[in-house]
Amino acid sequence: MFISIRRLVALVAITQLVASFSAVPVLVASHRLAKGLKEELNGSGPQAPESATNLIKRLVTECSSDEYLVINQPGLVLEDMTVNEADNWPFLRRYIAMASSVVGIPWVRGALDLDFIEQYIISTCHAETMNVVHDDDQEVGNYIDTRTRVIKIDLSELPPRSDLELRYSVIREHDELIRKIIRKLPSPHYTIILTSDMPQNVHPIPNMVVESQPDKYQIFHDLVNDPSRELEIERNDRFHQTIEPYWSPDRNTINRYMENKKKDEIHFFDYDLWTRNEKLILTIIVMVLTLFTFQLTKLVKLLTETVFKKDKGLITHTKSE
């Protein structure tokens, strides 16, 4: 009994539907090096949300970043982040290229718990949160301290892929928004976590196909899987020199007044005082010695004359007798 073409097509469609799964892409990029992140993944295929979350926790545990950008882009799929779509993400790709650690996961079976990730960063790195919910960089206020920040960005949903022109336009706007927010950061040490909270149906793709067409089935394959990244090295050493902060002295305080008063006091045996006024002191010493010598000479002369007169008087008196 032969199966009709229509039934065969329907059977294939049902088989694919049953085999498909819901997934979201996840991109993690850290300006500072975090070794061994990929050890948390199970092979190169679709990953469980727990594996992706453990990868992020391993990165966060080091608290090597001053800012953590947790970006939720509803409707984002792998096809939006391939090499072919590079022109839509000029600024994000620039930050990826600068990062020391980058991991791209094309498919995670289910959305990540971004609220849990936010709280984990806050509790682990003693951070505080800034929220961006209206696609406006002005929602990120000015920094008044050096505390670690979690900048949670909830972007507007992407238009459907049936209207690619509009979808690409919105992606470019969001890429520009990310650039504006990063430029506001006072520190270059940041981490980017980009994903979606809206899983999309994905048909399984054989590993052989994925490996043969990485530009199509990997997140920004040319950057994330660049051969230079096989060796985990810190790419931003020049930013990481430890510099002691300059603390401005207290102004108009009792402590400063007392310190200045002590500095203004003159101490006779102060070595610095003698060193600073060496020429003046030598001049005074010479003048004193000169005056002393002059007075001593006068005294000696006076004594000599007095003794001479007495001797002369004694001699005259003896002769008269």
Curated annotation (Swiss-Prot):
Keyword presence, Oxidoreductase: no
Signal peptide start-end: 1-23
GO biological process, one term: fungal-type cell wall biogenesis
Residues modified by glycosylation: 42
UniProt topological domain (Lumenal) ranges: 24-279
GO terms under cellular component: endoplasmic reticulum membrane
Location in or out of the cell: Endoplasmic reticulum membrane
Keywords (A to Z) from UniProt: Cell wall biogenesis/degradation, Endoplasmic reticulum, Glycoprotein, Membrane, Signal, Transmembrane, Transmembrane helix
Membrane protein topology class: Single-pass type I membrane protein
Cytoplasmic-side positions: 301-321
InterPro entries: Big1
Residue stretches spanning the membrane: 280-300
Family affiliation: Belongs to the BIG1 family.
Protein name, UniProt field: Protein BIG1
Organism per entry: Debaryomyces hansenii (strain ATCC 36239 / CBS 767 / BCRC 21394 / JCM 1990 / NBRC 0083 / IGC 2968) (Yeast)
Gene this protein is translated from: BIG1
